[in-house]
Structure formats: C-alpha cells, structure tokens
Amino acid sequence: MAAKKLVYGDEARAKLKAGVDKLANAVKVTLGPRGREVILEKKWGSPVVTKDGVSVAKEIELTDPYENMAAQLVKEVASKTADVAGDGTTTATVLTQAIYEEGLKAIASGANPIYVKRGIDEAVKIIVEELKKISKPVTGRKEIEQVATISANNDPEIGKIIADAMEKVGKDGVITVEESKSAETVLEVTEGMQFDRGYLSPYFVTNAEKMEAVLENPYILIYEKKVGNIRELLPVLEKVVQTNKPLLIIAEDVEGEALATLVVNHIKGVLRVCAVKAPGFGERRKAMLQDIAILTGGTAITEDLGIKLESVDLDMLGKADKVVVDKDNTTIIGGKGNPEDIKARIEQIKKQIETTTSEYDKEKLQERLAKLAGGVAIIKVGAATEAELKEKKDRVDDAVHATKAAVEEGIVPGGGIAIFRASRALCNIKEENTDKAWGIKIVKNACKVPLKQIAYNAGFEGSVIIEKIKDVDNVNYGFDAATGEYVDMVEAGIIDPTKVVRTALQNAASIAGTMLTAECLVAEIKEKEEKLPGAGGGMGDMDF
C-alpha cells in the first residue's frame, strides 16, 4: 500500500479553497449572455472552443493532490446538475465557490462547521419552497422556445428547432441530438419508441465514444422469460446469421452461457447482436412487450402462446430501421409494424386510460401511449468547422434537457433573478443558534453571486444592479445583461427552468457544506518512476 501524506485544519481548508477557486474561476467566465469562451486543448484533434460550463469543468485536473480533491468535488456539482437538469452547471459552480468562501470566513471566526452546514441546509429548503411559489407552468410554444434559446447561449435558431421538436413529439417524446453531414442544423422526426433498459454487457457497444450499441435494420426477438441455455437460442441465431442482419434480444434476462456466447460471437463479428432486459414488471411487462411487438411487426413470445424459443421463425421477429442502446435506454426507430395495428393499439390504450380509476395505472398507461404515439425527434446539428460543431452540439444538448426540465417543473425569471428574489424569504428567519444563523446568512449572500457574475461578464457592476432592483416588488423585475436594460425578465423572454435553478442550488450547497466540515485531507505520496535500463545491444527484439 502506498504511503500517504496528510494536512489538517487551516492548511487543509486553504488547499481546498485554492482548488475550488482554480476550477470555478475558469468556469464562471462563461456565465450569462455575454459570457466568454474557454479554449480546451485536446490530445487528439483541434482544440475545442466552448461556453459550456460542464465541458470546461470536466477538462480540469490540478497537479496539487489536495487542490485537485476540491476541483473534483466541484466538478461533481457541475456534472450532477447537468445530468439531472441539463443546464445550470456554471450557476452551480459559482454558488459552490460563494458558499464555501463565505463558510470559511465563518469557521475562521470560530463558528462550528457542523452547525454552519445545518444552517446552510435549512436555508436551501426555504429557498426551494420559495422558488416553487415564484414558478409558473409552461403553457405554450413561446415559452418553450424562449427557454431553449437561452440554454443554447441565446441562439434563436436552436430555440425554434427545439420548440418544433417538442411540438411534434410532445413532452413525453424522445429528442436525440446527432451531428449533421452538412453545415445546416435540421430537425427530423421518426416514429419510434424508447424504454429504460440498457445493454446487458458493455461488450455489445459498437460506438465506444458514446458507449452505444447501434444496430441498423435489425431483427428483434421479443421473449417473456429468461434465456440461460444457449441451445434454446441457437436455431433462431443460425437463421439470423444467414440473413447477415443484426439482432436485438429483449427478454426478462439473458444470463450465463447464453450471454457469454452472444458476447463472444459479437466480438468476433460472427453476429452483430445486443441483449437488453424487458421493460416493466409483471402484467405491465407483458403489455409493454406486446406494444413493442405491434410497433415492430413481430410476435411477443409469451408463456400463454405455448411457443418454445427453439421453434421461433424469422417472421415472428420484429423489424426496425435502427435500434440505439446505451447503458440506460433502448430506442427503437422506424418500427416495421402494420400502421393499422399500431393505431388500434393506441386507441385501446386511450380507452384504458379513460376507464382506469388508479392514478398510478393512468400514469403508466400514458407513458405507454407516449412511447407508441410520440416518436423520436432527431436534431441534426451542422456547422462550418469541427470545432464549431462540437461546441454547437453541446449547446443543443443543454437546451433540450433544459426545455424538458421547464415543461416538468415550470419556469422562473432568469438572469440570476429568481434565486436572488427567493433568498429574501431568509430575512424573516429568526435562528437562536448563532452558527446556524451564520449558515443561513451565507446562503443569502451566495444567492446574489450568479446575478453579480452575469453582470460582471457583461461589463457592468453587479453591486450597483442589486441596489437598483432589490426593493422592487415585481419578482420578475431584473437586469438584461445582453442589452444593459432593466426589464420584466419573463416578458423579455429571459427565463430559466425551475428545476435548473433548484438543482444548481441544492447540489452546490451539498458539496460546499460537505467541504466546510472537512478537517483533514489524505493523499497518496507519488513514487518516483525509476528509469529502466536500456535493452542489451543486438538482442532487443528477440523473445525467449
């Protein structure tokens, strides 16, 4: 086991602060409509120019191990916020830095870190409740377009395309982002279905960069039971191999020698195959398998049909134009089912929704309806250069996630205004414990920082702006950093998804609070690599 080195107390906190500052200072320059670009060096290919906070954060590794610990924790804030809400990564990073910096001042003045953290957590809960009160539901296309435009770094073209996509597939439909072969960014809508089951083995992956298994024109075997014995599968595998087409297996599970054999044959290139677990459970699983069968024109091989796996023919298998499987989801695009059968199935599910009394059943039926009727929208992103394409694709990805978040939890005024207004609720809190009160004050002050940073990046003084807007009763009243004017943010179309703002604050407070309670840092002492002596002359290439 490698030897460790340790630092304690103030020295540890100083190291953490240095790490937080290095990462946050690189990320926060991208915040707001006039945020700056960051250029990232790549080992292969051209450098990437980006204004996406999480892309910048992911690239940062620091040489000092203690500083790097802090940087990795802040990176986690950005990544987690991006995963959950799709946007707000820079805001989350800025808030983490602000909460940690203010918290260190409290600790240096003798406050108990545990009580300070409790105060921070209490304040965050109050602000989240306040955000819910400020939040408004998304009612029309205009708001969807505004959210998408802002999340795509104020690009109205992307905003319009995403609004079109949401309109065509609905809020429950699937929107994927791909690279276009031309310089144009276009929207394609394809009938399709997605369910939340990923590949059973990463060895099925065909695109290592995206960690996806992509099957073009595959056959689809839909089986209700587990597959453990490869002999059961062999007849259908042999038939599929003769057609030279890939195969997607959807079953309760594929395990043991059956899975091992599929993996080996896939790696050797004998058969392009991918196995996934069937979606749902119990009777609902049977219904979902039937949905997939109708969509793809196949037969769901269920126990009550009395068909054995060995006797399955090619005409019982479903077909599709394309199947994309990642570690969490399977998307079937262009199912070759009979349109009349699909329509009849949709009507059947609609009738079930009308007659069911259970809210849970209704929700699950609506999910199935969306999967059958929604389809898949593909946004093909185009640009003049590879560097611009990568940057634009990142922005479109962000905007799609943020738009879905807006539909889910509603919208609040943007530009850092919502969190600033919500923090006013903390003024009414009377906390007897002085250390907890300090924690509440820390969050109140931190909530001003995103607004200040947006203004600073646009060349304005944030403190002056806060003084001008703080006493105005209209919660939507704020500062448009793009034009330098004071406006009603919602009317001006400057809005953020509530989920983005909420997630950014919760994640920032969680990590910053955790770092404040740290008293000791432990890192490995790196051993010096000894240079190996050169090989003997004349015999260097010989094996013995």
Curated annotation (Swiss-Prot):
One of its GO terms (cellular component) is cytoplasm. SUPFAM superfamilies: GroEL apical domain-like, GroEL equatorial domain-like, GroEL-intermediate domain like. It comes from the Bacteria. ATP binds at residues 30-33, 51, 87-91, 415, 480-482, 496. It is an enzyme of class 5 (isomerase). GO terms for molecular function: ATP binding; ATP-dependent protein folding chaperone; isomerase activity; unfolded protein binding. Signal peptide: none annotated. The keyword ATP-binding applies. GO terms for biological process: protein refolding. Its EC number is 5.6.1.7. It catalyses: ATP + H2O + a folded polypeptide = ADP + phosphate + an unfolded polypeptide. Pfam families: Cpn60_TCP1 (PF00118). Keywords: ATP-binding, Chaperone, Cytoplasm, Isomerase, Nucleotide-binding. It is found in: Cytoplasm. Belongs to the chaperonin (HSP60) family. Forms a cylinder of 14 subunits composed of two heptameric rings stacked back-to-back. Interacts with the co-chaperonin GroES. Together with its co-chaperonin GroES, plays an essential role in assisting protein folding. The GroEL-GroES system forms a nano-cage that allows encapsulation of the non-native substrate proteins and provides a physical environment optimized to promote and accelerate protein folding. NCBIfam families: GroEL, PRK00013.1, PRK12849.1, PRK12850.1, PRK12851.1. This is Chaperonin GroEL. It comes from Sulfurihydrogenibium sp. (strain YO3AOP1). The lineage of its organism: Bacteria, Pseudomonadati, Aquificota, Aquificia, Aquificales. The gene is groEL.
